[in-house]
Amino acid sequence: MSSSLHIESIGQGQELVILHGWGVNSSVFTPLHASLSEYRVHYVDLPGFGHSDPIDGDLDDWVDAIINQLPNTAIWIGWSLGGLVATKAALRYPEQVRGLVTIASSPCFMAREDESWPGIPPQVLSQFSTQLQQNIGKTIERFLAIQVMGSATAKEDIKQLKELVLSRPLPKNSALAQGLKMLENIDLRAQLPQIEQPWLRVWGRLDGLVPRRVPPLMPNHQAHFTDLLLPKASHAPFLSHRDEFLTGLTDWLNKF
């Protein structure tokens, strides 16, 4: 089945793919455009978000649809839910994903108390699921507020996020429900050691969705895994600490 995905390709140079998180669209990366102009960057609206058509199925179906519409060899960068998509792409298509960058993204977003795994409390995700059926706009707004919580520039960050997100159509209900289900159910922890590509993991120490206890629990014995912790950032470090984020990202990209 062929579905139309909205992909904005800007710049010239090394191929990068950038994927956004839940409830938003690729316009959240607009502030990065000028700084990444020396790369060929493909800004993707995930299925059912922004200008992209929805795609039935699960995470694998999303990955298959996206990879078919992108260059054969690129470095994939994913923020939050987009990090899950990028990680799965790196695992499924190692020859097409040259490198992996995850931003404020966990391999298992939901807390697993029986395993002492830190994450989003299950009741929070179920509340979002219930609220979706009542008011999409307010649900997304609440989620955006959680993303910037903890940042010293939270007020400015939420204003910027809202302006960017609302520049495109609201996500489809089906896509929001799919995304929540992925955040609730996907657990890639056991597969992480299989990642062969260079992998940069960017964390915000004040992140309310990916707790600071997650990075120390990640596999780190591979020489090609690199962690960048931004001490004053929360869940959207590319907005709140753009210069710091870009310096870390471009330094890492320059090693290719």
Swiss-Prot record:
It comes from Shewanella woodyi (strain ATCC 51908 / MS32). The active site is at S80, D207, H235. This is Pimeloyl-[acyl-carrier protein] methyl ester esterase. It is an enzyme of class 3 (hydrolase). The lineage of its organism: Bacteria, Pseudomonadati, Pseudomonadota, Gammaproteobacteria, Alteromonadales. Pfam families: Abhydrolase_1. It is found in: Cytoplasm. The gene is bioH. Keywords: Biotin biosynthesis, Cytoplasm, Hydrolase, Serine esterase. Disulfide bonds: none annotated. Its EC number is 3.1.1.85. One of its GO terms (cellular component) is membrane.
